[in-house]
Amino acid sequence: GQSNMEMPVSGFMFQPVEGAVDAIADAGMYPGIRMFTVPRVSSKTPLDDCDAAWQTATPASVGQFSAVGYFFGRMLYKALGIPVGLITPNWGGSTIEAWMTVDAIDATPGIDHAVAKSGTYDNSIPQRLYNGMILPVCRYTAKGFIWYQGESNRRNWYDYKALQVSLVKLWRNAWGDAKMPFYYTQLAPYRYEGDTLRSLPLVIEAQYRALAEIPHSGIAATTDLGNPTCIHPARKREVGERLAFLA
């Protein structure tokens, strides 16, 4: 995902995560949770490895874990009582197209392909993050995906549903499982200024419309969790736990 998936338990500068102090202090109670944070790599060519290591949940490490990912994993660990491994590729400001292949974008019907392939930054050029951050970990066995992205696709909200459907097909194919669960987060309310004032609700609508076209999927509602003046809402525990309830 992008920055709301990236946001660590310790929060961003002047943007805290609610309950972070207790979550960090209690992390030693969950030694079966481990997280693998994929380094930010934007690559023109497909990669098969990355420079990172698994981290065990401890008070010293959890502050840098993805907050949504950690709270998701913590809920699963409490419910199942088995080790939980979380692989988290994320890049703030990234577009959905960067996490897809050019071929997958080209094969998506009914979209504005020129706009979809118009990204110019490392985290928005099509296929760059798929090459550098998804392919290196797709040989791991996985039980499912969680996804928190969409703010950076306000410019082409009208194509977001179709692009998300294509992304899910692509990722499931990469893992060799056409039924792998895909659970994602509704974008939380936030007041963008200017011409984009209406675009965020339209992305949210596209997210809900995608449910009907993505089997084995679910969405975690966040209408009650947003902050109209902060794009990174503090209540990440609820987001992670709602995704876990879907799982």
Segment roles from a protein language model:
Residues 2-247:
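Cell-envelope and extracellular/periplasmic
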